[in-house]
Design a protein with these regions (language model features):
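Cell wall/extracellular polymer interaction/catalysis modules
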Residues: 8-139, 143-150, 154
Length: 154
């Protein structure tokens, strides 16, 4: 029996990994990596962060935002189930106002603080939009690592 290429379906995906390095009362500091290369740092609320694990990212219009945002979909969550309380990747400076497991992107300045957030957010969004236009599935993996366990390159 001969099989044609039509019998196989390949899913192309982009995998984003966030290595959480430091858990303090000022926030959860992490490093965002794509294809083995550090893209930026992350910061999350010290208590209201997502559990480590696998998620998907989709661009969705959120009612209280002026543009489509990269939202973080929990396992089995459909895009049409997204609401204003859905966690997302976003620009910002510090984590204390974050709710719902949102993640701020930027350059680490101190524990619990990132700078140049809008610049890093825009760069990552452009990269995610390109992947989305190519119909790539965007996966997010969050791993809890201590600073001693993560490669010095990150």
């Amino acid at each position: 029996m001969a099989l044609s290429i039509n019998h196989f379906y390949f899913t192309i995906f982009m995998e984003i990994i966030i290595y959480r390095r430091r858990f303090t009362r000022w926030g959860v500091d992490g490093t965002l990596v794509i294809k083995g290369t550090k893209v930026c740092n992350t910061i999350e609320h010290p208590e209201r962060f997502l559990p480590a694990g696998d998620y998907e990212i989709a661009f969705v219009s959120i009612a209280n935002k002026s543009r489509k945002m990269p939202v973080i979909l929990r396992k089995g969550q459909a895009v049409w189930e997204v609401g204003i309380n859905t966690p997302c990747l976003k620009p910002g400076n510090g984590p204390m106002t974050l709710e719902n497991g949102c993640i701020i992107l930027g350059k680490a300045a101190a524990t619990g603080l990132v700078i140049h957030s809008q610049e890093y957010f825009d760069r990552l969004c452009e990269r995610l939009r390109k992947a989305s236009k190519k119909k790539e599935c965007i996966k997010l993996r969050i791993i809890d690592w201590g600073s001693d366990e993560i490669s010095i390159a990150f």
